[in-house]
């Protein structure tokens, strides 16, 4: 049994698994920094579990954003187990709790009671870029950041409701509550952040997956065919 396991776990597969785990955590850390350093101090509640946690932390100041993310993500994971099963959840379970851990760690290492600067738009840009790029890294490797993605998976399995529309409605609801709590200016920043995040995330994913294609016209195709077959192997070495 052990010999068969060693046979299947080749060095290349171990490297791919290590790279996947590193990129997953890199994306989650970037997202967590965007939440803890830029979104939370400015009350940028533009959707998702982080936005809901920011609102709840304002209503119940005894708990911080990281604590509420733990509670919400734990509840969503339980829902995922009940409606989807453990196989369908996959890395979503890890991502949900790892993101909560990284946010709590950022709040412990760098506690902020006020924004870093007086420029709200500058902070919005960093909040959007870090969150969007982090999400793009995670989505590009076939994982997710957890949270409301679990709700999307449940809706996709049991209803005919378009997932994107359902999540947009829930995010808009969080934004409206944020606008009521923090004022119209913050509410408008939240709406802008919600729009920019999806745009930046799509652009980041396209940039990561960018490929160059060339067409070779030749009367001697054999050397070109040989190069086409051997070049990917050479690049992997």
Describe the function of each predicted region.
Residues 2-221:
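Core subunits and conserved enzymes of cellular information-processing
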Residues 227-233:
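Conserved small/polar residues in nucleotide/adenosyl-binding loops
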